[in-house]
Amino acid sequence: MRLTVLVGPGLVADAALLASSTAAACAELDVTGRVVTAGSAGEMRSLLAATEQPVVALPGPTPAARALIGAQPSGVVWYDLTVEPPVPGAVHLAGRGLWGLAWAIRHAVHRLRAPAGRIAYGPDPDQWGDLRLPSALDTGPAPVAVLLHGGFWRSIWGADLMDALAADLTRRGYASWNLEYRRPDRHGWDATTQDVEAGLVALRELARDRPLDLDRIVVLGHSAGGQLALRAAADLAGRTSGPRVALAVSLAGVLDLAEGERRYLGDGAVAAALGGSPATAPRRYAESDPMRRLPTRVPTLLVQGTEDSLDLVDANRRYAVAAAGAGDDVRHLEQPGDHFAVIDPASVIWQDTMTAVDARLGR
C-alpha cells in the first residue's frame, strides 16, 4: 500500500518536516508514503482525481483549495494543521498541528484495512459510530466493545484515535462500536454525556439485525473517555431498562475531576469541559466525577502506564483504593508505558488488558 500526502497551495509548513513526519508515520504502519505538492487548486483537484487511495489532503489556506474539501473522492482524509470548523460530509480532521498529521495518516490507512459501517445514532453530524463486525461468528453473537476516545473533551480530537483498537478488537472476535460524540467546547457538557448514553442505547436497535451479544458489553474509554466510560456504566446500571455494561475499562482515564480541576489538569480542561468548578457547577461534578459515583456496581478495569502524567498515575491509584473500599469489583493494571501505549495494539500493556477483558467476558 502506498499513501499520498497531498499538500495544497500556500500551506504554512516546512517541506522537509512534512516529508519526515510522513515517512515516520508510514513506517509505523508498514506502508510506503510520499508527499506531493500542488501549485494551485486546479492542480490539487486533478491530483485528487488521479491518485489512488489512501490519500491525506492538506488543503492549506486558499479558498479555492478549501472548496475542494468534501467535494472530491469520499475516501480522502482531509487534515488541517490549524483549528478549523468541521466540514459536513467530509472526513475532516483539524487543529492538531504537524504532530497530528500522523493521526490523519493512521486514519486513512485503518479506514482501508479495516472498513467500518458508519451509523448515525442522532441528527447531529457528531452523533455517529463506526461499527465493525468480526468475520467469524461460528460461536454465536459477538461480544460488543464500545470505544470512547479521549482528548480532554476537546473537539480537535475524535474517534479516529481509537481506530487501531477498533480494528484489533474486531480481529479478536469482538464487534467494535467506535463512538463519536458532541464535545462540550462546542455543545456543552450535558450534550456530551447524553450522547455517550445514546450511543450505548443504540446497541439495542443495532442488535435487531446483527449478531451482537448485549449481555457481554465492554466499554473502553481512553483518557477523558475513561471518565465518560465509568459514568455511562454507572448511569446504565441504575436504569430499569436498556443495555447494561458487563465491564468498564478505563485506559489512562481522568478519574478525579474535582482534583483534576484544582491541579489545572490539561491546561484547565476539566473546568472548560464541565463549565466551571465544583463550587460553580456542583450538579455536573456530582453526576460525572468518578470519585463521586462510587460505588458503581459495575466490574471495572483500570489500565495505566507508569510513564504517563504523574497526576493520572496518582488518580488511578487513588480511585482503585476508593473503589475497592466502596465494595466495587475493581482491578488496577499498572505497567510501563506512556499515555498512548494503552491504545497501541502492539504494546504489552494492551495485550495484558485484553487478557483481562477476555477472562471477564468468558472468552
PLM feature spans:
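Short, surface-exposed "cap/lid" segments of acyl-processing enzymes
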Residues: 5-17, 135-168
